[in-house]
Amino acid sequence: MNKTTFENVYYWEGKAQIPQEGQFIKLKEDKTLEVPDNPIIPFIEGDGIGPEITQAMLLIINTAVEKTYNGSKKIYWVELLAGDKAEEKTGERLPQETLDVLKESIVGIKGPLGTPVGKGVRSINSALRRAFDYYSAVRPVYWMGQATPIPNPERVDLVVFRENTDDVYAGVEFFAGTPEAKKVREFLIKEMGAKEEGFPEDVGITVKPMSEFKTKRHVRKALRYALENNKKNVAVIGKGNIMKATEGAFINWAFEVAEEPEFKGKVVTDPEAEPGEGQVKLTKVITDQMLMQLVLKPEAWDVIIAQNLNGDYVSDLAASLIGGPGFVPSGNIGDGYALFESTHGTAWDIAGKGIANPLSLTLSGAMMLEYIGWKEAAQKVYDAVRRTLAEHIGTPDIASGFQKQGIEAKAVGTMEFAEEISKRIE
């Protein structure tokens, strides 16, 4: 793929090229950001369609920043390697250099990264989350004008906060028939009083850790977001009626956070009360009920706080309501450190064809602009995407969605779509 030439984009050449013109974002003692007018922001193209959608994102975000600030602010983009390209160039799928520059940069963005199946290779996405303690996966879901499978898609405007470090994703598993599984089974039966009928000899076991500390920091982030953005109805979900020690505890800890001095008087927990000015309402909802409510009345919820596994389910269902993950941005956020990303996979079947939908990564780029305080530029991106979709212009998947609903649409390639959006940035 031929790369578009950007004077403020520094591609990897034997090592990361750090521009002298740029400055690194700084993390203050209170974990807020000190953002210069010329921040260095690293990007990872990713695998599959990653390079194509990254080029599109760079064009759109650069255009929005230039149109908004007329040169007084500029991002200096630095390419880092991870995934297939990193393995090809360095022999490692996640080079130490990438981790070092991400640490110094505080904020970054990446395309999709694959994990080879059956080769014993650990997920790079998981490794990055662990390295920088990105403990909240934040996924806004809203309609931009695309064809959708549900009527009145404007009803969908919510943000899923998925806890990113706890739960069954901890990866502590014991496969059926192994000595380890046998040892754990015997311990549970003999020492912990577990019933033998629940743990037959051929049982496999996965551990589901959930801690008070990790839960509460995640809930605080979600409640702060809701209060700062005037999001009134907040749900904390889980199967606490079944898994009392984990998901039940998660819900209880969420309500304890609501009673902390920071939130006292700002978070309404009475089921019969309505939130007033400057308040939000926190409601407990069983996970299966939430899945049903998202389909039947998505407008009921503004923010959903979830555990890792339930958040995985809920965020994908919510995305499906507005056309799928190709329209949804995402940010992995910790205490200051943040890595924004596309929500979809590598899509190797269309890689290199120049037809991939770049909106997920582009909207993640706009989300990143908001995160560093450049909200005016972010809004220009959102407005331009809406204008472009309102004219029924998009990559083949977007155009096909319109056509299936009897709407005439214009199908364009990835970069042409990015150019159409950029032309509409005002």
Curated annotation (Swiss-Prot):
InterPro entries: IsoCit/isopropylmalate_DH_CS, Isocitrate_DH_NADP_dimer_prok, IsoPropMal-DH-like_dom. The keyword Amino-acid biosynthesis does not apply. The keyword Iron does not apply. The record marks 169, 239 as: Critical for catalysis. Keywords: Glyoxylate bypass, Magnesium, Manganese, Metal-binding, NADP, Oxidoreductase, Tricarboxylic acid cycle. Gene3D superfamilies: Isopropylmalate Dehydrogenase. D-threo-isocitrate binds at residues 123, 125, 129, 139, 162. GO terms for biological process: glyoxylate cycle; tricarboxylic acid cycle. Homodimer. This is Isocitrate dehydrogenase [NADP]. It comes from Aquifex aeolicus (strain VF5).
